UniProtKB/Swiss-Prot annotation:
Residues 25-63, 154-511 are annotated as: Disordered. Residues 179-196, 285-318, 451-467 have a biased composition (Polar residues). The modification Phosphoserine is found at S334. This is Probable eukaryotic translation initiation factor 4H. InterPro entries: Nucleotide-bd_a/b_plait_sf, RBD_domain_sf, RRM_dom. Gene3D superfamilies: 3.30.70.330. SUPFAM superfamilies: RNA-binding domain, RBD (SSF54928). The keyword Protein biosynthesis applies. Probable translation initiation factor. GO terms for cellular component: nucleolus; P-body. It comes from Cryptococcus neoformans var. grubii serotype A (strain H99 / ATCC 208821 / CBS 10515 / FGSC 9487). Disruption phenotype: Sensitive to dithiothreitol-induced ER stress. Abnormal sexual reproduction; decreases pheromone MFalpha1 expression and abolishes hyphal elongation. Residues 331-349, 420-434 have a biased composition (Low complexity).
Length: 511
């Protein structure tokens, strides 16, 4: 084991002095310090962002992008066109509605052909447009006016880019100015380009009259002659397909017929079926139908039933004879025919044996029934009145008058009973208004306003014993008022004819 080396001792200030004089550092050998970015050129205007006119003081986009590192490559200026149209692109225009007139007036001395300002769907300018000039010199002078002021904005004028051209030439539809063509478009096989399906040029197709196809009928052209050099093998590039015979649809003369096209009988058959007669197939319902409009029903052909009936009859060598008719006189009836005749079965309906209801007849029957009941009631009422008249009953008006008279008599009887006078028998005759008299027959009133009782004529004819009796003094002790009793009875509408009940009602009246 080697002996361990001892470190040399040195003062601290000597160590720092040696490191300062050497000028090297271990960090310089391991890391690369980043460099500071290039200083940006200050604009000469001295305006800051946000100040009015700041964006107008900035240089053009091309020069501004080249001032910082990593900027995209500046757009190359387009060369001047040598053939018309000589169009210039005008950018950084104002958004005022009259910007087109201002641009036209700006280039008026250059005699512009047209000025077009691009607008949005709402009709507002987008801030750029195009101006077309007659000559190349006019376009050069327009380019010299770039970075000029127009409506307070610095406009830019450049050469307009030509419209982009695709790899493929424009089609016939793009070049056509009239979209409603009277002849069909040129077929793809007739062009100079090779066909993608066959790999080589093909012969042009026959020119057809397409104007006839717009009518009701389609007139096909004559079948083209078979192509020369057609081989059976059509596979591979450079080979064409074998022409086929015209089908049923090619030879149809009526294209608006509702009936389906009939198939061609002599169509191509497989080799293993060549020379074999086709099977006889009876026509179906669809083959025998003449009308193919929607909603019609297929009718069963009648020829099948006739043929079946003809086949069912046995054939014999001898000719058939007509059966002899047995005629009978017209006067004689045919009982056998009537006996054998069966009644026809009623047609079955969705409602069965139900019949419609005659509402008018039912209403009439109900009215007749009500009228009959009303007549019976009226008749019974008349019979009841007749029975009352026969039994001696009084009419209705007489009954009302008798009730009033009986009421007055009951009141008078009650007054006589209270006064102590004998009651008289009620008269049998009807009152003809004798109860209503003048003011002289009315009862007199005393000092307190009570009516005084006066004896009636019938009570004055009684004996002298009743006249000699002393009269009661009603002024000292008034206890009863006949007028109040009569008023109470009238208000209560007493209809009782019994004298005792009336008297009881009068006695209950108190003053």
């Amino acid at each position: 084991m080697a002996p361990k080396k001892k470190g040399q001792k040195m003062a601290l200030h000597e160590f720092f002095e040696e490191a300062a004089t050497s000028g090297t550092s271990w960090a310089d050998d391991d890391f690369d310090l980043p460099t500071a970015p290039a200083a940006r050129e200050e604009s000469g205007s001295g305006l800051k962002r946000g100040d009015p006119g700041y964006f107008e003081s900035l240089p053009d986009r091309g020069s501004r992008q080249a001032t910082f590192a990593g900027a995209p490559v500046q757009r190359e200026e387009l060369p001047l066109p040598t053939v018309p149209p000589f169009t210039a692109f005008i950018g950084n225009l104002s958004f005022e509605p009259d910007v087109e007139d201002e641009v036209r007036a700006f280039f008026n001395d250059l005699d512009p052909v047209s000025v077009r300002i691009v607008k949005d769907p709402q009709g507002k300018p987008k801030g750029f447009g195009y101006a077309e000039f007659k000559t190349q010199d006019g376009l050069k002078q327009a380019l010299d006016r770039s970075m000029s002021q127009l409506q307070g904005r610095t406009i830019r004028v450049n050469v307009a880019e030509a419209p982009s051209t695709s790899r493929h030439p424009p089609s016939a539809a793009e070049e056509a100015s009239q979209w409603r063509r009277s002849t069909p478009l040129a077929s793809r096989e007739s062009s100079s380009q090779p066909s993608r399906r066959t790999g080589g040029p093909s012969e042009p197709a026959a020119d057809l009259d397409w104007s006839v196809a717009r009518g009701a009928k389609f007139t096909p052209s004559a079948p083209a002659a078979p192509l020369s050099g057609v081989r059976r093998d059509s596979s591979g590039p450079g080979h064409t397909r074998e022409p086929r015979d015209p089908g049923v649809s090619d030879t149809a003369d009526q294209w608006r017929s509702n009936k389906p096209l009939a198939e061609k009988v002599d169509r191509d058959v497989p080799p293993h079926q060549a020379g074999v007669a086709p099977p006889i197939v009876s026509p179906s319902l669809a083959d025998t139908e003449q009308t193919w409009s929607r909603g019609t029903k297929l009718r069963t052909p009648t020829t099948t039933s006739r043929q079946s009936s003809a086949d069912s009859t046995p054939s014999s060598g001898a000719p058939q004879e007509r059966r002899k008719l047995n005629l009978k006189p017209r006067t004689a009836g045919s009982p056998s025919a009537t006996a054998n005749a069966t009644p026809a079965a009623p047609a079955s309906g969705i409602f069965g044996a139900a019949k419609p209801i005659d509402s008018a007849a039912r209403e009439k029957a109900a009215e007749e029934k009500l009228a009959q009941r009303e007549g019976e009631r009226r008749k019974a009422r008349e019979e009841a009145e007749k029975q009352k008249a026969a039994a001696g009953d009084k009419p209705v008006e007489g009954e009302k008058l008798g009730w009033r008279e009986e009421k007055l008599r009951s009141i008078k009887a009650a007054q006589d009973k209270v006064a102590g006078k004998p009651t008289t028998a009620p008269a049998t005759t009807t009152n003809t208004g004798a109860g209503r008299k003048g003011s002289a027959d009315r009862a007199k009133k005393d000092e307190q306003g009570f009516e005084q009782v006066q004896p009636s004529r019938k009570s004055s004819q009684t004996g002298a014993t009743s006249e000699n009796k002393p009269k009661k003094d009603y002024s000292t002790r008034p206890q009863f008022s006949f007028a109040a009793a009569a008023g109470a009875i009238r208000n209560d509408l007493v209809e009782d004819k019994d004298e005792e009940e009336v008297t009881k009602g009068v006695e209950e009246v108190k003053i």
